[in-house]
Amino acid sequence: MSNREVIIALDFDSLDKTCKFLNLFENQNLFVKIGMELFYQNGLQVLHEIKNRGHKIFLDLKLHDIPNTVYHAVKGLMKFDVDIITVHCAGGLTMLNQAKQAVFDQNKNTKIIGITQLTSTSETEMQTQQKISTSLQDSVLNYAKLAKEANIDGVVSSVWETKKIKEQNGNNFLVINPGIRLEKDDSGDQKRVASPLDAKNQLADFIVVGRPITKDNNPLEKYLEIKRMFV
């Protein structure tokens, strides 16, 4: 049986819109992503609401600060029983390690996942704006190696780096792929996109899918279609 899961990105600006959307998924045990837009505008009540519905939470806040601040931020989030929290690999080894330490200290099973390069970033943008001279793939692999050294649970990357990340860090090192689109979907602001089947073939553990599901006329049907392709 596959351990792969589809995570639905709840890219809404209100709890009311979120609840109306989730009501379409009666009898489905979901894994959902709460990002900055939803969390910052609605606060902790959105975590309570989704947990009360029995869904798993990927809290994608991309924490990036000094190690002590990130430690206490993660520690504070442990009381809400979130399943995944993201931190920026660019924060460095100590910051990443302190994020994981906060989970250990609270005796929780929350996964800490590192952000490598955003799927909206092209190689040219990375090289000219971030002043990173390597290839984009090498930058992602370097961040993944750092994440492994820091003892966190995995990373977020595009589909196209996934297999090499697994080869470098082992199959138990989790990889989450955003930027998932079906053939007929608009790629929007994503530059490095792929299909659910691509992600499956590249050995991803999770895919994050937002607009292709949330903007569809039948979100449940589209979710189940994508789930069949990936899981």
Swiss-Prot record:
Belongs to the OMP decarboxylase family. Type 1 subfamily. Pathway: Pyrimidine metabolism; UMP biosynthesis via de novo pathway; UMP from orotate: step 2/2. Catalyzes the decarboxylation of orotidine 5'-monophosphate (OMP) to uridine 5'-monophosphate (UMP). Pfam families: OMPdecase. This is Orotidine 5'-phosphate decarboxylase. GO terms for molecular function: orotidine-5'-phosphate decarboxylase activity. Homodimer. One of its GO terms (biological process) is 'de novo' pyrimidine nucleobase biosynthetic process. The gene is pyrF. The lineage of its organism: Bacteria, Bacillati, Mycoplasmatota, Mycoplasmoidales, Mycoplasmoidaceae. PROSITE patterns: OMPDECASE (PS00156). GO terms for cellular component: cytosol. It is an enzyme of class 4 (lyase). Substrate binds at residues 11, 33, 60-69, 119, 181, 190, 210-211.
